[in-house]
Structure formats: C-alpha cells, structure tokens
C-alpha cells in the first residue's frame, strides 16, 4: 500500500471497504459514487500504528524461511535476519510458535508453497496445491481475493494476493478495498478460531 498504485501517493478503494477506513480514522475523499481516494502513506501508517497499539509486534528486518509443522498442523514460523539470508551466511534460525499463521506474502504465496512442497500435504484448493494467480481482472479480482481468504490448511491462513495466487483467481488492479476486506476477514476468522 505504501507505494500506492505505481508509486502514486493516492490510493483508491471502493465503497464496500469504507467502513475499515473509518474504523482506522483515515482521511479520504469521495471520487465518484463507489470509489474513494486516500493518501497511501497516511493509510499505511495508520494501519501500522493501530495494529501496534492493539498488541501486534512488527519484527524489523526478519524473513520467514520455513514453517513449523507438528502433528499435521502449521504451528509457527522459522525466522532469520533478512541480511543473513541475503548474504547466504550459515546462521541458525529461530522458531516462533503460533496458534495461527497467516500467509500474506503476496503473489509468491511463499508459506503455502513451502508447506505443500516440504510436507506432502494437500491445501484446501481444487488441485491441493498452489494454483497460481490468473491474469488481471479488476472487478473479479477484488471479489475473489475476499472469497479466497480462508484457512488453507490446519493452522495456516491465507489473505491478500497470496489468497489469489493459492486459489487461482485473477490478480487485482490498483484498487485496495479487496485487500483491506481480505485482511479484515482473516483477522475475524482467527479471532473466531482462538475463542
């Protein structure tokens, strides 16, 4: 989101996601009957700020290099410093246990690919594997990213463009409402799962 659409400072979202922007107290302007415009930097900053104040921890310069797989369930992530991985240094990673893991890695859907490849399991898709995103269709992509947001394997949830890639739905255009709605949906799914 920080980079907007092709690095423009303004981003667009549709009416269906406006309630999320209001919840985060982000400034916006009406563009037409269904589209709204907001500042990309303010929007991203507000989301990060509110997430941290709600209890989220953001790890700086970390990369997830694997998942923890116990009893046929994704149970956490294996992390290392990004510069260590980039330089190819042999440094043992750390494990972070988690009740739920979200693959929000975008088009690459790295966590889902890793889980399927390394553990011989079937994801909750038509093929049992990462299908791969289809070519761009703005309207369908915005709807399908939300539909594809789900628990894709026990303990592993998928959202955003990773959901599109895993489920084989079209990539989205420069509209951000579907991404926000996908994030809200995965948060609600996990809240329900942890009750």
Where are these regions (language model features)?
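Residues forming the flavin
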Residues: 1-19, 24-195
């Amino acid at each position: 989101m920080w980079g907007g659409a092709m690095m423009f400072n303004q981003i667009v979202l549709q009416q269906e996601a406006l309630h999320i922007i209001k919840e985060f107290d982000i400034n916006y302007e009406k563009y037409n009957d269904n589209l709204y415009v907001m500042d990309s930097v303010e929007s991203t900053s507000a989301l990060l700020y509110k997430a941290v104040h709600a209890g989220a921890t953001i790890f700086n310069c970390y990369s997830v290099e694997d998942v923890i797989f116990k009893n046929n369930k994704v149970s956490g992530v294996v992390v290392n410093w990004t510069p260590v991985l980039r330089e190819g240094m042999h440094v043992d990673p750390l494990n972070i246990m988690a009740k739920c893991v979200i693959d929000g890695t975008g088009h690459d859907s790295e966590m889902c690919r890793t889980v399927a490849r390394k553990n011989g399991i079937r994801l909750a898709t038509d093929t049992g594997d990462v299908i791969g995103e289809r070519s761009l269709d703005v309207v369908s992509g915005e709807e399908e990213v939300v539909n594809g947001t789900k628990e894709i394997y026990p303990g592993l949830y998928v959202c955003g463009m990773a959901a599109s890639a895993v489920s084989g739905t079209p990539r989205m255009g420069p509209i951000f409402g579907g991404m926000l709605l996908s994030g809200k949906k995965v948060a609600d799914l996990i809240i329900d799962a942890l009750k």
